[in-house]
């Protein structure tokens, strides 16, 4: 099983429109031989098809394991993505995983969508 290069894993993968659940996930690569520890990075995943935050995490963690990586869910929330208005709002929490650090999530989203207005709040579900 090949070990994934973390740089090849997109930081953000979210649906293009609507309000949907999202999770913030830390992905760990297996340590390279001679390396003191595994490398890691945070990724944001959000999809309309997910009824529960765990649905997203289960799919993503399964995909990452196939690439030789381990994952941990850092929390979740919701994303309101209005592509026509170029606005993304991150808010709320996951009943299963607790709230994600929305500040981290929004920084990653801003990097992918630099011409968008990206905001966050801890309130709401």
From Swiss-Prot:
Tissue: Expressed abundantly in heart and skeletal muscle.
GO CC, any one term: cytosol
Transmembrane segments: none
Listed EC numbers: 3.9.1.3
Biological process per Gene Ontology, one example term: lamellipodium organization
N-acetylalanine carried by residues: 2
Top-level class of the enzyme under EC nomenclature: hydrolase
Principal place of residence: cytoplasm
Residues reported to bind substrate: 21, 94-96
Gene3D superfamilies: Janus/Ocnus (3.50.20.20)
Catalytic activity: N(pros)-phospho-L-histidyl-[protein] + H2O = L-histidyl-[protein] + phosphate; N(tele)-phospho-L-histidyl-[protein] + H2O = L-histidyl-[protein] + phosphate
GO molecular function: actin filament binding; calcium channel inhibitor activity; enzyme inhibitor activity; protein histidine phosphatase activity; transmembrane transporter binding
Active site: 53 (proton acceptor)
InterPro entries: Janus (IPR007702), Janus_sf (IPR038596)
Subcellular localization: Cytoplasm
Pfam families assigned: Ocnus
Keywords linked to the UniProt accession: Acetylation, Cytoplasm, Hydrolase, Protein phosphatase
Disulphide-bonded residues: none
Quaternary data: Monomer.
Function field: Exhibits phosphohistidine phosphatase activity.
Family from the record: Belongs to the janus family.
Name this polypeptide is given: 14 kDa phosphohistidine phosphatase
């Amino acid at each position: 099983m090949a070990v994934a290069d973390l740089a090849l894993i997109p930081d953000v993968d979210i649906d293009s429109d609507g309000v949907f659940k999202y999770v913030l996930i830390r992905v760990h690569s297996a340590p390279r031989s001679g390396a003191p520890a595994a490398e890691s990075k945070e990724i944001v995943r959000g999809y309309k098809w997910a009824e529960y935050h765990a649905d997203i995490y289960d799919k993503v963690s399964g995909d990452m394991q196939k690439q030789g990586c381990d994952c941990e869910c850092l929390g979740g929330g919701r994303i309101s993505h209005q592509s026509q208005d170029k606005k993304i709002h991150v808010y709320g929490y996951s009943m299963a995983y607790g709230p994600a650090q929305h500040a981290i999530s929004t920084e990653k989203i801003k990097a992918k969508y630099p011409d968008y207005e990206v905001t966050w709040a801890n309130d709401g579900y």
